[in-house]
A protein has these predicted regions:
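Boundary-proximal intrinsically disordered activation/regulatory segments immediately upstream
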Residues: 7-73, 162
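Amphipathic alpha-helical repeat scaffolds
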Residues: 46, 135-142, 253-259
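RNA substrate-binding interface of SAM-dependent RNA methyltransferases
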Residues: 10, 55, 91, 96, ...
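Short pre-catalytic strand/loop immediately N-terminal to key active-site residues, enriched for Gly-Thr
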Residues: 40, 130-135, 244-252
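Active-site/ligand-binding-proximal alpha/beta "capping" segment
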Residues: 203-251
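Extreme N-terminal basic, low-complexity initiation segments
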Residues: 2-6
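Structured adenosyl-cofactor binding patch, chiefly the S-adenosyl-L-methionine
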Residues: 112, 149-150, 161-177, 234-276
Length: 276
């Protein structure tokens, strides 16, 4: 069994055994939006998320790992050895220190500091998703995951919307941040120039007269999904045509992330088959 050898072979400083270590304290600060913006970095936790970032071309600045937690995780240990071989700083931590660093209830023993994703926006986006006043990070992350799967060209975060780099949003997106161009816009004046000119804009709205599957999605288009508690902003309502998902049961509306996914995959269906 080569696993213990692989872990021992990683060239790294002495194990961090105190949560007061400055490197740990600096990493913990990345749970705050302000610090993420100041450093232009974020903390990823778990093998799936770190691997997705690396496979998307991201080079981690630092890896933190708990050797005892990886003793029965050969895939993680192999991946860690590859990162070390590539010259990436790998810092071992005690289980207690890693638990203090982690944001999950059951940490997987690996975390990484990486640059904030900044993929270039497309010059001529085919389908744009706008998140408007979506404040739940789980919904935002799930919408990003669905958008990437449905072939959305770009995602724009309107004012008064959750930070897409919130740790819960990152986990819910399952790596979509590293494959999908997105921008956070503090003002609508920043957002509007990023939209394709003359493209129709639609707003998911429970009581709209127009059904989502009666819309022409094959050409360039924009979809706005508003928050569940407060709905979309006045700006979005003025610029977009409302569309609804007809309900057959007694449920009045769907969760924002589910509604967004239903509409996005209708757009994907039309584009894939080139039919309305």
């Amino acid at each position: 069994m080569l696993l213990p050898l692989q872990l021992d072979a990683i060239q790294s400083p002495h194990m961090i055994t105190s949560a007061k270590n400055q490197r740990i304290k600096d990493a913990q600060k990345l749970s705050r939006k302000r610090h993420r913006e100041q450093t232009q970095t974020l903390l990823l936790e778990g093998l799936r998320l770190v691997r997705d970032a690396v496979e998307s071309g991201v080079r981690p600045q630092t890896i933190f790992y708990a050797p005892t937690q990886l003793a029965n995780a050969p895939d993680t240990a192999d991946f860690l050895a590859q990162l070390d071989k590539a010259g990436i700083e790998c810092m071992p931590c005690s289980e207690a220190v890693f638990a203090a660093l982690a944001n999950t209830i059951t940490p997987q023993g690996i975390a990484a500091i990486v640059p904030l994703p900044q993929l270039a926006l497309p010059a001529h986006p085919s389908l744009t998703l706008i998140l408007d006043r979506v404040r739940d990070p789980g919904n935002a992350g799930t919408l990003l995951r669905s958008a990437e799967a449905a072939g959305v060209a770009q995602v724009l975060f309107a004012p008064d919307t959750v930070d897409p780099f919130n740790d819960k949003a990152m986990r819910a997106a399952m790596g979509a941040h590293f494959r999908l161009p997105l921008r956070v816009c503090a003002h609508w004046e920043e957002l509007e120039p990023l939209l394709p000119p003359h493209a129709p804009c639609y707003l998911a709205e429970a009581n709209a007269a127009l059904a989502y599957d009666q819309v022409e999605w094959r050409a360039s288009a924009v979809l706005v999904v508003g928050g569940e508690a407060t709905g979309a902003s006045q700006t979005a309502m003025q610029m977009a045509t409302p569309i609804a998902i007809p309900m057959l049961g007694h449920t009045e509306s769907l969760n924002a992330s589910i509604a967004g996914a239903v509409i996005l995959f209708e757009a994907a269906r039309q584009r894939r088959r080139n039919v309305l």
